[in-house]
Every structure is written in C-alpha cells, then in structure tokens.
Amino acid sequence: MTKTLLIEEKAYLGGTATGAQVSMFMGFADGEPDRPQQGIIKDVMDGLAAAGGTPGIETIYLCGRRDLDIPVIPYESEILKDLIFDLVDQAGVELLLHTRVIGAQVEDGVITALTIHNEQGVQTVSGKVVIDASFHGSVAVSAGCRWEIGDEKGVLQPGTLMYKMAGVDIARYEQVSQPERERLAQKGIEEGCLYVNNLLARPLPSGTIYSNMSRIRIDPLDAAQWSRAEMEARRQVRRISRFFIENVPGFE
C-alpha cells in the first residue's frame, strides 16, 4: 500500500499561508473568478467557509485602479491551520512535525532517501517519490539541482512582515478615498513611518485588519542578515501601526 510522509520543520502546516499570516490567497483563479474551483483548493475553500474563516472570492483593485483587478480569498490563518491538519489526517498522511531535512541521497539522478533531524537525532527515510515544497527548495538543491536567485542583477522582491490590528472601525476606514489613502501614505513616507505609497490594510471575517506594509531588502540565504531583518521588520510594524492610529480614520 502506498504511504505518504509529510515532513515539516514547524509546529503547523501551511508555510507562509499560516505561519506568516499572509491571510489572502491571491491570483489562483486563472482570470475566471466565477468558475467553481476544484481539487485541493476547493477542499480548502469549502472548509474555510464552513468554519467561518473566509467570505469567499472577492475582487481587489490594486491602487484603487479598476484595470488592476485581482480575484482573492481573504482567510483567517488560525482556522486554516486547523483545517489543513484535518485534511491531512483524513487523507491518511503520516506526519512528522518539528523535523528538518538536512540532506538528500541520490543514485543515478534520482533521490532515493532523505536525511532528517529532530529530537530523536539524525535519521534516514526513503521513498519512491520526493516532492520538495520547502521554502528555499532546499531538498532539490541538496540533491544537486541547479538554482537561481533574484533577477539578472540578483535583486529580490523585498521581504515583509504581515501583522494584524483589532478594534478598527472598518466602516469608517473603508470610506477613505483612494486619493486620500495615497496622500496619507506619502505623508507617512516623508515622516519615515511608512514604506509603500498606498495603505495596504484589509478586513478579515473576524473584524480584524491585516496589513502588508513593511519592506526590507534581504538575502534569505544569509542567516545573519535574515536575523537582523526579523528585528527591523518588527520595528517597522510598530512605526506603521502608530502612524495608522494617529492619522488614518477608523484606527483612532
């Protein structure tokens, strides 16, 4: 009988979708937001809806422009954590949390086994098929696969730290016009409190607001640089949230 083993370094599944509180599936509808979704994403959407974790597919307009419409699904990340555990359990998947892959054994160009590490020490697991869904493609790289990072100049998309705010008067905030949002954003940039030229804060079913407004240049392959970035990102979030409280209607 075929068995599936899922290895995860964290205490939860879902990667950045859950652990980083991304809170929005974006651009998966292939330009047809009204078409019923199938497969795994349908299971996820149905489960989130049943648990009150999503309002379903919505359309957002980047920078308030009607020609930049994108279908998205806002969701509650904690509800998604529970849902993914349930789906994995129902599918009969064996799970190893708090476990990291530290190497791959390759024969004739095929991965035959993985070296893993957890509190039980270093172990080896083998399988016929290995699917690398790691953040950096670490399994594929350790197996000798080619890799690239950044554009032709090595420039990467900046890092960001998602955060949430509660107690917001969402109705008042949603009345703020796009020109006013851009004016406030420019004010925040000039004061050294904001880092993007728009107010990127949207509501979730729970009534909280999630935001993606910090921006940090970082090489994610440099652990020391990444560590400093984690601290700076939190400083940025404090500046951003304070600016919202002092300047944006609904956040007082």
Where are these regions (language model features)?
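Conserved N-terminal/central alpha/beta ligand/cofactor-binding core
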Residues: 3, 8-103, 107, 157-158
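Active-site-proximal beta-strand/loop segments in catalytic clefts of secreted hydrolases
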Residues: 7-10, 133-134, 213-214
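A conserved hydrophobic secondary-structure block that centers on an alpha-helix together
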Residues: 97-123
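Glycine-rich, N-terminal phosphate-binding loop of Rossmann-like dinucleotide-binding domains
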Residues: 118, 134, 143
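Rossmann-like dinucleotide-binding core of oxidoreductases
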Residues: 137-252
